[in-house]
Regions:
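Surface-exposed patches in mature extracellular/periplasmic domains of secreted proteins
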Residues: 87-93, 154-155, 228-230
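Alpha-helical cap/lid subdomain in secreted, periplasmic
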Residues: 105-226, 282-289, 293, 297, ...
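N-terminal secretory targeting modules
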Residues: 1-53, 60-66, 218-305
Length: 305
């Protein structure tokens, strides 16, 4: 091969390499864009890594489970890994005795630099009906604002046993936002088993009950993957009061408060919004006198058994 032919061949190879490189760059860019635009259900189908957040009460924490690994969320994590063959991380911030307001606080206070793709929320058992509509919607708004591309699944707790006023309130909020519902009430009722066979204490699902929780959430996910749906509706809030929760500031007792004596703490701060207190669980009555600008604001008492 003479030099002219060699130069021609070299030019052709360079052109081919440049074309292949360009195609690879375009492919990577398209994949990156798809990953950014996909919601949770499409990410599962496309094999992308997903991050799941669980915000619930004691049932969400796996209370009632008799065998480690049988917790509904651990079964779900194992299943999801078989679906997309990629990384599936689950962050569970559920706590026993929590109400919807606590779920809002946990969501807003979470600072782990993870962009969640799916949030599973479940409250109602410990909530009073008064305020539930605002607090539950505050969780939805918190997730929507903090993780704009995050899908939500709402679990209707089997411990309610029927469609109580709390459950109806939650269903109404989910309908408004287009949030898929995992109905463990009907799942327990249609299981062919007595309720006492699914819960040893009448509230928390045992191993058999955990299996039903897992299957119910799994079915919701499978249906949305198959239909390529599941994104929340971009709608206005139902209750305007929910926007009082938009501004969230966490003041920690260890660094923001000044201890005056064994029972008195002071905080110098300027803020507006809904005031809440995070209690340490102590049996009996837990009373706090709250003063704002030197005047008694409120004296709430919380009782823990």
């Amino acid at each position: 091969m003479n030099k002219k032919d060699e130069d021609k061949k070299s030019a052709e190879l360079q052109a081919l390499n440049a074309k292949l490189y360009q195609e690879e760059q375009e492919k990577e860019a398209a994949l990156k864009q798809k990953k950014a635009e996909d919601i949770f259900y499409q990410k599962l189908s496309d094999g992308f890594d997903v991050n799941v957040l669980v915000v619930r009460d004691s049932i969400g924490a796996g209370a009632g489970t008799e065998t480690d690994g049988q917790q509904w969320f651990k079964q779900l994590q194992a299943y999801l890994r078989t679906v997309n063959k990629a990384s599936v991380s689950v962050t569970n911030v559920s706590m026993g005795g929590n109400t919807s307001y606590a779920g809002y606080v946990q969501t807003m206070a979470l600072d782990d630099d993870i962009d969640y793709d799916l949030a599973v929320i479940c409250y109602g058992q410990n909530d009073a009906l008064q305020g539930l509509d605002v607090y539950y919607e505050a969780i939805v708004q918190a997730i929507k604002n903090k993780y704009p591309n995050c899908s939500i699944i709402s679990i209707l707790e089997s411990s309610q046993r029927d469609y109580t006023s709390n459950i109806i309130t939650i269903q109404s909020i989910c309908d408004h936002y287009g949030i898929p519902v995992a109905d463990t009430i009907v799942a327990f009722n249609n299981s062919g088993k007595a309720y006492d066979d699914l819960s040893n204490d009448g509230v928390h699902p045992n191993d058999a009950g955990q299996e039903i929780y897992y299957e119910t959430v799994k079915n919701v996910i499978d249906e949305n993957v198959a239909a390529s749906t599941g994104k929340m509706e971009n709608v206005d809030a139902i209750n305007a009061d929910v926007h009082k929760f938009d501004n969230f500031i966490w003041y920690g007792a260890d660094k923001d408060f000044k201890r005056v004596d064994d029972t008195t703490f002071t905080l110098n701060a300027s803020a507006s919004g809904v005031f809440g207190i995070d209690y340490t669980f102590e049996s009996g009555d837990n009373k706090a006198d709250i003063y704002v600008d030197g005047e008694l604001f409120e004296s709430p008492t919380v009782t823990f058994e």
